[in-house]
UniProtKB/Swiss-Prot annotation:
Gene transcribed to yield this protein: BAM6
GO cellular component, one term: chloroplast
Subcellular location: Cytoplasm
Residues engaged in binding substrate: D119, H159, D167, K362, H367, T409, N448, A449, R485
Coiled coil: none
Name of the protein in its database record: Beta-amylase 6
Family stated for the protein in its record: Belongs to the glycosyl hydrolase 14 family.
Reaction it catalyzes: Hydrolysis of (1->4)-alpha-D-glucosidic linkages in polysaccharides so as to remove successive maltose units from the non-reducing ends of the chains
Amino acid sequence: MTSVLGMMNPNLINGRNLHKGSSIFVQDKETKKRVQWRLSIKEGSLRTHQATASSATEPKATEFNTTTYEDKMLTNYVPVYVMLQLGVITNDNVLENEESLKKQLKKLKQSQVDGVMVDVWWGIVESKGPKQYQWSAYRNLFAIVQSFGLKLQAIMSFHRCGGNIGDDVNIPIPKWVLEIGDSNPDIFYTNKSGNRNKECLSLSVDNLSLFRGRTAVEMYRDYMKSFRENMEDFISSGVIIDIEVGLGPAGELRYPSYSETQGWVFPGIGEFQCYDKYLRSDYEEEVRRIGHPEWKLPENAGEYNSVPGETEFFEYSNGTYLKEEGNFFLSWYSKKLLLHGDQILDEANKVFLGCKLKIAAKVSGIHWWYKTESHAAELTAGYYNLKNRDGYRAIAKIMRRHHAILNFTCLEMKNTEQPAKAKSGPQELVQQVLSSGWREGIEVAGENALPRFDRNGYNQIILNARPNGVNQDGKPRMFGFTYLRLSDKLLNEPNFSTFKMFLKRMHANQEYCSEPERYNHELLPLERSRNDESLEMFMEETEPFDPFPWLDETDMSIRPFESVLSLLRSTFLRKKS
């Protein structure tokens, strides 16, 4: 009798599904369906039942459509990209260490990585003056990436590098913009103490002509337009497949509420960033309009490193956030952020309209204090998310409006890895945000928030990339994953062998696929943004929903010592040859 395990592809066997003392490893209904699907694979092909034109009641011979095992598995393929170093292009707009980079890219290509991601720094390209764009160094970089057959995700980085976790270089926003800020510091985000954050421009100046006759949004638009014009060959040839639009600090759609340059230390709740004169004036006008001129911007929300329960605003049982005044402020604060993202994504959509690529925007994974009533760290960042109010649905709807991918962070994190005092819930947060995107019918991608080289971190990413494991439909499945970040430590052993094992699992144990349409990633011309729903409608749809079902652990895990054994095997074969 043929063994059940013998019928299965050995690459798919995972001990977590085997129940001791049982010859059949069924954990629940969904697991049973996956197992039955895998058992239908025999001799490299999968037979899928097809309904005939005649009625199903007629007892005629069943017709089958034969699909290859590889084709079916590719529906579960998640492409993986690697972020290049932050300073791969220097402040002087020069591509340094070109030969070293080529060696690294060659190694990445051999590992079967799908592509790379790179920050295209506003502070470098437009440093000489308004509309004086210098793209030569980036063109040189893109040509090298193309020569290795790698795809490219380009970030329109309208923020400063330096001051965020992991920043190892300092690249400010353009000097001529900073000089405008010297005479008008209210162009920058400001906390209640009056401290300015020069990491990026405040959303309050999006539509103010303060920058040599242009608004902030017009500067972002012109920059993206120049990028498209100067990189047309890389776009049309399919090298550049993704434009991530910077929308705030670290390129993320949020306020700079937890900046290390301001003294923030994890897990501080952060501070609201709406005290520049433009946002202050806007709020005062809004409260007068609704008949509450006595309402002021919060002065009782603590400081960067406060604990929620120690503040009057975030106090769990009777905090300001629970009252009418607090609710109005948080609605206004989050709405300003949504308007900001909506407007810039609309400009990006117009700039890249018709291009065969995706646009994307990143949302920060603020997981600390998630398991408290007030979600204080999320609120100060602009995500109005509570137990009875979903703060991510509106963001997902904005992405849907502009045909954009929602890119989320902290996919590698587990609750048990976080300090108890932080009340963190990265697993629940990831499930909530990804589910919000999938429920809206948009593509969702992700990143790790911190560098990881261990199988536990990788296994958590694999789980979040395919929450229900490998299955016939491949859904739900993340559109892609970008690994943070290329380094010598990643490329050294045994880390690199573990990373290659991770790539294999993300690719559903298939070889690198150069034809995206085979895993349902065909790039079509970008369509114009939808305008069938207003932002006000988005803001009203805040009812929480249960997240999609999620396995406890991935069905394609990297097992203990697996990468080490792979390394020993490859070393042995190399020496033997």
